[in-house]
């Protein structure tokens, strides 16, 4: 579960159109959220508040062997109006989980040709083509907003440990990230890491410097294929693409010890055209250490995800297999939206990346935020989304009584029937046309349109689902450990509790090696 400050940082990235999934360090974020999730230690209480749209504070108190705590502040130059407290926040936004990777279409305002830039300005800002003054004001506002900053600081007690973070947006595709830690127990009483990141739809370039060991690093991530928004406005881009392939590498050199480092990774993310279910596969290789790691993550249904990871070292021939899953529970006794409102909600795209404010439209009080969404979806999906509302229950949401029926394979038959009816209708209407090439192209376009509807509908169902809790389980065959984690909403609190069970090497009996519970409240 994210801390409130981490949640606000993600809101800042979402507000400023910064794509976290395009960062090389997040290439295994999905598998890590399901397999390597942290277990709480002891008792911890976190109380946070956002006094204004620009300023927030957080107080944390924990009891593990001794009582300690921390006090944190966060300030943003841009208003964080898309944030919520623990009472109203979507569980999918507050918890790290499966993420649909879309690095090719989530970023906006990319540095492309002047014709595209002119079209972008005219589509997004020019409501009156004859009002040149408004155009100039909007251009100036966009240029000013592209240089937003975020300041964060935390003080720990008892003791004198401090940590700070500064995010400075240089332009719309480049930012400077500085992290500092001051602790008397560290060498030279602290360390500092500086990141200079250039993030575009096509590639990522990152320069890193750490005062620890005078470490210098370079990271690159390249997305194969042509960007969808290369020659068209982002508002007119297709909502989904079936697959994304990303290849990245990182180079490290410790100047103090003269030690090099090298690793490379590949990520493949796609969606089933028949069910709309997404999956992600990754492969990471470290040739210096001889380590290979591969992961496979698939969202088996709207409320469940399965993940597996296999590690192998070709120097020592050591291997390990890790398995894990997450299972969401649906909220009960909720006031569902009307079918008409739900149909409108399913037609309205909520986000491009799940886990980053993508479920803001699940409650009536989030209506104003949903109205601000600038994403685009074709109005031709209205018939299909109304069919989904009828198919999946009242309000277009999946209720707790439909847990056993929330998988899409049994729901695809109406899609196939509609596809067949559409194909038959098209064939009858075009039977008098002597040009067979036109018929073939039209059938291809029809299939592509229905495939896009399937993937869009599945994502909308995930976004519209109102979850109350999630259970995560992971195990490792080599370590012989089982990790259990429950996260959910209790009244106005977000609660996270879990345990790690391991085999005692002496008695060969299972025992709790770690246990804790966290309470978080924010308003």
Swiss-Prot record:
Which cysteines does the record link by disulfide bonds? none
Keyword Phosphoprotein belongs to the record: no
Recorded GO cellular component terms are: ERMES complex; SAM complex
Name of one Pfam family that matches = MDM10
Per UniProt, the ranges with Polar residues bias are: 352-362
Q: Does the keyword Translocase apply?
A: no
What does it do?
Component of the ERMES/MDM complex, which serves as a molecular tether to connect the endoplasmic reticulum and mitochondria. Components of this complex are involved in the control of mitochondrial shape and protein biogenesis and may function in phospholipid exchange. MDM10 is involved in the late assembly steps of the general translocase of the mitochondrial outer membrane (TOM complex). Functions in the TOM40-specific route of the assembly of outer membrane beta-barrel proteins, including the association of TOM40 with the receptor TOM22 and small TOM proteins.
Q: What is known of its domains?
A: Lacks alpha-helical transmembrane segments, suggesting that it resides in the membrane via beta-sheet conformations similar to those predicted for other outer membrane proteins and porin.
Q: What is this protein called?
A: Mitochondrial distribution and morphology protein 10
- Origin species: Lodderomyces elongisporus (strain ATCC 11503 / CBS 2605 / JCM 1781 / NBRC 1676 / NRRL YB-4239)
Provide the gene name from the record.
MDM10
